Amino acid sequence: METDAPQPGLASPDSPHDPCKMFIGGLSWQTTQEGLREYFGQFGEVKECLVMRDPLTKRSRGFGFVTFMDQAGVDKVLAQSRHELDSKTIDPKVAFPRRAQPKMVTRTKKIFVGGLSVNTTVEDVKHYFEQFGKVDDAMLMFDKTTNRHRGFGFVTFESEDIVEKVCEIHFHEINNKMVECKKAQPKEVMSPTGSARGRSRVMPYGMDAFMLGIGMLGYPGFQATTYASRSYTGLAPGYTYQFPEFRVERTPLPSAPVLPELTAIPLTAYGPMAAAAAAAAVVRGTGSHPWTMAPPPGSTPSRTGGFLGTTSPGPMAELYGAANQDSGVSSYISAASPAPSTGFGHSLGGPLIATAFTNGYH
C-alpha cells in the first residue's frame, strides 16, 4: 500500500552510490508501487520500491526507483533490451546520487578587476587597492604575442572584510579610468555542468545583466562576471560576433541608384505607414546605403577575431589558459573586461601570461 510519507528516492547530495539501486523512467501514470515491485521482482528480490508522486496532487511523476537486495538483479534488468509495464515501454537505468550544486561565493579574499587602461601597471593596481587594506597579491593577464595586458586582472587581499569594503564601491577610478570590481567566483559556480572547459557559452548572473562576449582565461579556479556587449551601435545590441577567423569589415556598399520621384499618386493616399515606408526606401543625392558602417574619422580600424573596436567588451568566447601555461594559472577562468578606451587591440590567437606583484610569495 502506498503512503504519503516523504519519498527518499531522490538521493541527498551526500548520499553514496548504491549499485543495487535503479532509476525507472517512462512509467505510465497508472503504474503503482505494487505493480512496479511485482514487475521487477522477476529479476531478483526487491528491497525497496518507490513511485515518485507530486506532493500536492499525489499524481505519479512518471518515474521511480527500485532497489534490489544484490547487484545480480540489476544485471538481469540491464541484460534485457526492452521492458514494458502497464502497456508502456519503460527505461530502467542504474541510479546515481545527485551532486551537490556549488554555491555562490559570498566571502572571498579575491576580486576581479576589469576595464583597466592600457598604461596601467600591476604596481598601479596594487598601490590603489592598498588604501582599503593589505594586498597579498596583484595580477594582470597578459597576451604573450603582444606582451600587453588585456585590461583586467585579479587582486587578493589579506582578509574577506577588505573585499567587502572594496566591492561596496562597484566602480573605482584607476589612472583616470573607471574600472569594475567584483568578487571572484569559483568556475564551478559559473558553469556547474562543466561547460567552462569547452567553448560553450557560460551565462552567469542572468541574461538581463550579462550577455555573451565571454573570454575564458586561465586563472586557478575562479571566474569573474562578464560584460554586456557595447560594440558599434550599428550592430544588434547585446550581441557580438564571436568567430575567431571571421573578419568584420566596415566597407561602404556600392552606390544605390536614385529612384524616380513618385508624383502620380500622393503617398499619403495609402496611409501614413505606407508613406513613411516608401519615403525611407528612397535614397537621394548621397549615393550611399543608409546602413553602411563607414568608419568615422580618427576611429579605430576594424579588427579580426571578434574584436569590434575600442568599446568592445574584450576577448570573445576564446579559450585561454592552455595546457602549456603555468599550472598555477590554467585551472581558473575569468571573463572579458571592457577594452581600454585608448584604442589598442590585440589578436586573440596568442595564449595569455600573467604578471604578478612580487611580494615574497612567488
From Swiss-Prot:
**Modified residue Phosphoserine is at which positions?**
S191
Give the UniProt keywords, A-Z.
Answer: Acetylation, Cytoplasm, Nucleus, Phosphoprotein, Repeat, RNA-binding
N-acetylmethionine PTM positions = M1
- One of the GO biological process terms: regulation of translation
What SUPFAM superfamilies does this protein map onto? Answer: RNA-binding domain, RBD
Q: Which GO terms describe its cellular component?
A: cytoplasm; nucleus
The record, for CDD domains, names: RRM1_MSI, RRM2_MSI
Q: Which residues form the RRM domain?
A: 20-110, 109-186
Q: What is known of its domains?
A: The first RNA recognition motif binds more strongly to RNA compared to the second one.
Name the family.
Belongs to the Musashi family.
Q: What is this protein called?
A: RNA-binding protein Musashi homolog 1
Origin organism of this chain? Rattus norvegicus (Rat)
Question: Lineage from the top down?
Answer: Eukaryota, Metazoa, Chordata, Craniata, Vertebrata
The encoding gene: Msi1
